[in-house]
Regions:
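Core dinuclear metal-dependent hydrolase active-site scaffold
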Residues: 1, 56-114
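Glycine/Thr-rich phosphate-binding loops of Rossmann-like dinucleotide-binding domains
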Residues: 15-16, 39, 124-125
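Active-site metal-binding motif and surrounding structural segment of the metallo-beta-lactamase
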Residues: 1-32
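Short, charged/polar "capping" segments at the starts of alpha-helices
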Residues: 35-41
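Cap/insert and terminal regions of metallo-dependent hydrolase folds
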Residues: 104-169
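Short, conserved SAM-binding/catalytic segment
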Residues: 42-49
Length: 170
């Protein structure tokens, strides 16, 4: 059973099917106030009933069923983007994607059992690839995306014996 949908930020590649899915199954959506404002501004989602949208604040844990969820700030070019640390009392997982930089994110990623971590691009391939220069600059910027190399460094910073699963994603 799905008790809620956690949204990290309002970019289209993260919310494209949110309207239809949430309305069809009446599943609550949880996101920061800035992200919810961005979701409401994206007209292609259609009308989302206010009762389905729930604001969560950075560094203010909340409960969803048996889960304790701790939203944390991330560096990305969106309205108040977040990652999530999720604890069921036995295991702790985190979602940290769309990171431009990760310096202040590391503390939220310590002592995990599993993590979904961004590994977005090979720097050389991005530099010589077909994207226009402004997009390349955005992707490599402090509010863009984490390179594969920096993702590896972050993983080394949080690695410990109980970290059993690492899922690389965008």
């Amino acid at each position: 059973e799905l008790e809620g949908i956690l949204i990290t930020h309002e970019h289209v590649d993260h919310i494209q099917g949110l309207g239809v899915f949430s309305r069809k199954y009446e599943i609550p959506i949880y996101a920061t106030p800035g992200t919810i404002a961005g979701i409401r501004n994206y007209k292609k989602l259609g009308n989302l009933p206010d009762g389905l949208l729930h604001e969560v604040d950075i560094d203010q844990p909340f409960s969803l069923g048996t889960l304790n969820i701790d939203p944390f700030a991330i560096s990305h070019d969106a309205n108040e983007p977040s990652g999530y640390r999720i604890d069921n009392g036995k295991k702790v997982v985190a979602v940290a994607t769309d990171l431009g930089i990760y310096d202040y994110t590391v503390e939220h990623l310590k002592d995990l059992n599993a993590v979904v971590l961004e590994a977005n691009h090979d720097i050389h391939m991005l530099e010589v690839g077909p994207y226009p220069y402004p997009l390349k600059r955005r992707v490599m910027g402090d509010k863009g995306h984490l390179s594969n190399e920096l993702s590896g460094k972050l993983l080394c910073d949080i690695l410990h014996d109980d970290l059993q699963y690492v899922v690389l994603g965008h």
